[in-house]
C-alpha cells in the first residue's frame, strides 16, 4: 500500500512538473534566430572591422532576420528588402525612434537634431522645418550657383595638375568640394585659405563621422561607461564637440551681428542659419528652438551634407576606373549634351540619363551608411512570427539588401544598364534600394545630396579623361573599404587627369 501511495505521489509530482515545464516553454517568446554568444560580450566579437559584411555572412547562415546580443543591447539585423519593408513601412511607427548613443548625445546636444532625436513631437516639428524650409526643392534650387562655383574651383585645381602629369588625390579634393559647398549653403561663407578651410571643415566633419561610428563601451555596457574615460575616447569626443560647438557659436554670432547691423528681421534669408534664426522667432511653430537646438540642426546639415557627396563621388569614380567602357559611354553622353560650353550646368542634367544610372548603381553597391542610422522599437511587435521586444535596436543592412541576388541579377557586378527601363529608385519607395533609408526616418536631404553629386560627376567626366598613375591597371585599384558609420575607400583615390578641352 505504501508503495502504491508513493508511486501515486511521484506520478502526480511528475505530472505537475511537466505541466509547469510546458507552461514555461509556452510563455517563452519566439525570438529570431541568434548565433552562439559569449558571456558578457554576447555577439560583439562577431561584428568585425566591417560590420555590414560580417552581418551579411551571419544572415547567410541564420536567415534574413537575426537577433544579436551586443553586450547588454538586444539588436535586430535585417538583411532583405521584404523584411525591411515590414520594419520601415508596415510597422514604421513602432520603429520610428532612435537609440541614444554616447556620441550622438554629446555631439548633437542630447540628441536634439533631426537624425538622432527620439520619436516624438519635438522630432516631428524639427523635421517639418527641415523638409519645408531647409531642404525643399525650391531651397535646394536656390543654391545652384554655389554648387556650380564650388565645382568650378575643383575643376581649376585638377587642371593645374594636368600640365605636370602628376596624380591628384581625388578623395581629398572631393571632401574639399563637399565641405566647401555645405559650408557656404549652411553658413553663408567659408575661409579663404585652402589649408585653413580643409582643417576647419573637412577635418572636423571627418572626425565627427568617425566618432559617430566608433566603439564606446558605455553604449553596450552602461555600468562601465567610465571605461571610455580610461581609453581616451571620452576626451576625444569632448575635444571634437568643443571645436564644433565653438565654431557653430561663432557662425551664429556672426549672423546675429550682421542682422543687427543691417536691420534685417530675417525676411531676406541667405543661408540655412538665416532661415533657422528667422524661424526661431516664429511663434506659430509647434516647438521652441533654443540656441543648442539650432546648433544641433546645423551640425546635422554640416555632417550629413559633407559625407553624402564625397563618399558617393569617390566610389563612382573608382567604379568608372574599374569599368572604362562605362566611363567612355558616360563621357560621350555628357560631351554630346553639353557641346563646346566651358562647363556642365544644372539645366543640362535632365538630359544625362546614363549618368543618373551610374549614380543609382553606385548607391546600390556603395550606400554611404551601409547599416543606415539605427532605429529602436517603442513597443513589442511580431515580425515574421518572431517576437520583437520593446527597446530592441534595429540595423537595416542596406549594403546587403543592395547586393541580394534574390533582388538583383549579377548582384556583385557594376552594371548601370540594369536600371534601363527599370523604375526602381532610391527615394524610399523601393525597398531593394534604400541607401537613404525609408519611412518616417528616411533622409530628408536626398534632393540636396543628389544635386551635388550629379553636377560634380558630370563636370569631372566632361572636362577630363582619367587613368591610374604609372603602370597601374584597373586590376590594381584597391576597392577596400574604410571602417566607419559612413564608408569611404580605405586608400585615397589617386588618379591622373588629362584635359579634354583646351
Swiss-Prot record:
GO terms for biological process: fruit ripening. Its cofactor is heme. The chain crosses the membrane at residues 7-21. Its EC number is 1.14.-.-. Induction: By ethylene. GO terms for cellular component: endoplasmic reticulum membrane. The keyword Cytoplasm does not apply. It is a single-pass membrane protein. GO terms for molecular function: heme binding; iron ion binding; monooxygenase activity; oxidoreductase activity, acting on paired donors, with incorporation or reduction of molecular oxygen. Mesocarp. It is found in: Microsome membrane; Endoplasmic reticulum membrane. It comes from the Eukaryota. Belongs to the cytochrome P450 family. Involved in the metabolism of compounds associated with the development of flavor in the ripening fruit process, possibly by acting as trans-cinnamic acid 4-hydrolase. This is Cytochrome P450 71A1. The lineage of its organism: Eukaryota, Viridiplantae, Streptophyta, Embryophyta, Tracheophyta.
Amino acid at each position: 500500500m505504501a508503495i502504491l501511495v508513493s508511486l501515486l505521489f511521484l506520478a502526480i509530482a511528475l505530472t505537475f512538473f511537466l505541466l509547469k515545464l510546458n507552461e514555461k516553454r509556452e510563455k517563452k517568446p519566439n525570438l529570431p534566430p541568434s548565433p552562439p554568444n559569449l558571456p558578457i560580450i554576447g555577439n560583439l566579437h562577431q561584428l568585425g572591422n566591417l560590420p555590414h559584411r560580417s552581418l551579411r555572412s551571419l544572415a547567410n547562415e541564420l536567415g534574413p532576420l537575426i537577433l544579436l546580443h551586443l553586450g547588454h543591447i538586444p539588436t535586430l539585423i535585417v538583411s532583405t528588402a521584404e523584411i525591411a519593408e515590414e520594419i520601415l513601412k508596415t510597422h514604421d511607427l513602432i520603429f520610428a525612434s532612435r537609440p541614444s548613443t554616447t556620441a550622438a548625445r554629446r555631439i548633437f546636444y542630447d540628441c536634439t537634431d533631426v537624425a538622432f532625436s527620439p520619436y516624438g513631437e519635438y522630432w516631428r516639428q524639427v523635421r517639418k522645418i527641415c523638409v519645408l524650409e531647409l531642404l525643399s526643392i525650391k531651397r535646394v534650387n536656390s543654391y545652384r550657383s554655389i554648387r556650380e562655383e564650388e565645382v568650378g574651383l575643383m575643376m581649376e585645381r585638377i587642371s593645374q595638375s594636368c600640365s605636370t602629369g602628376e596624380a591628384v588625390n581625388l578623395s581629398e579634393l572631393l571632401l574639399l568640394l563637399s565641405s566647401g559647398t555645405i559650408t557656404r549653403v549652411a553658413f553663408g561663407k567659408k575661409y579663404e585659405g585652402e589649408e585653413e578651410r580643409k582643417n576647419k571643415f573637412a577635418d572636423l566633419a571627418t572626425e565627427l563621422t568617425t566618432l559617430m561610428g566608433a566603439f564606446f563601451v558605455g553604449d553596450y555596457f552602461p555600468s562601465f561607461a567610465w571605461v571610455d574615460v580610461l581609453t581616451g575616447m571620452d576626451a576625444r569626443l569632448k575635444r571634437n564637440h568643443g571645436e564644433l560647438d565653438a565654431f557653430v557659436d561663432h557662425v551664429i554670432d556672426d549672423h546675429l551681428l550682421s542682422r543687427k547691423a543691417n536691420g534685417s528681421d530675417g525676411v531676406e534669408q541667405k543661408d540655412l542659419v538665416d532661415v533657422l534664426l528667422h524661424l526661431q522667432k516664429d511663434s506659430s511653430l509647434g516647438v521652441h528652438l533654443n540656441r543648442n537646438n539650432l546648433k544641433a540642426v546645423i551640425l546635422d546639415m554640416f555632417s550629413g551634407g559633407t559625407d553624402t557627396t564625397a563618399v558617393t563621388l569617390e566610389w563612382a569614380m573608382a567604379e568608372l576606373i574599374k569599368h572604362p567602357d562605362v566611363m567612355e559611354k558616360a563621357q560621350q553622353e555628357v560631351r554630346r549634351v553639353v557641346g563646346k560650353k566651358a562647363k556642365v550646368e544644372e539645366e543640362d542634367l535632365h538630359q544625362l540619363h546614363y549618368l543618373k544610372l551610374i549614380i543609382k548603381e553606385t548607391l546600390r553597391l556603395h550606400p554611404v551608411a551601409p547599416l543606415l542610422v539605427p532605429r529602436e522599437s517603442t513597443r513589442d511587435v511580431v515580425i515574421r512570427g518572431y517576437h520583437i521586444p520593446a527597446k530592441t535596436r534595429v540595423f537595416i543592412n542596406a549594403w546587403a539588401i543592395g547586393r541580394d541576388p534574390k533582388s538583383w541579377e549579377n548582384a556583385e557586378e557594376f552594371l548601370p544598364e540594369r536600371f534601363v527601363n527599370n523604375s526602381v529608385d532610391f527615394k524610399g519607395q523601393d525597398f531593394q534600394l534604400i541607401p537613404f533609408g525609408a519611412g518616417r526616418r528616411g533622409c530628408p536631404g536626398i534632393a540636396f545630396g543628389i544635386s551635388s553629386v550629379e553636377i560634380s560627376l558630370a563636370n569631372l567626366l566632361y572636362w577630363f579623361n582619367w587613368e591610374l598613375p604609372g603602370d597601374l591597371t584597373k586590376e590594381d585599384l584597391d576597392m577596400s573599404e574604410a571602417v566607419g558609420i559612413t564608408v569611404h575607400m580605405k586608400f585615397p583615390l589617386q588618379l591622373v587627369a588629362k584635359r579634354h578641352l583646351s
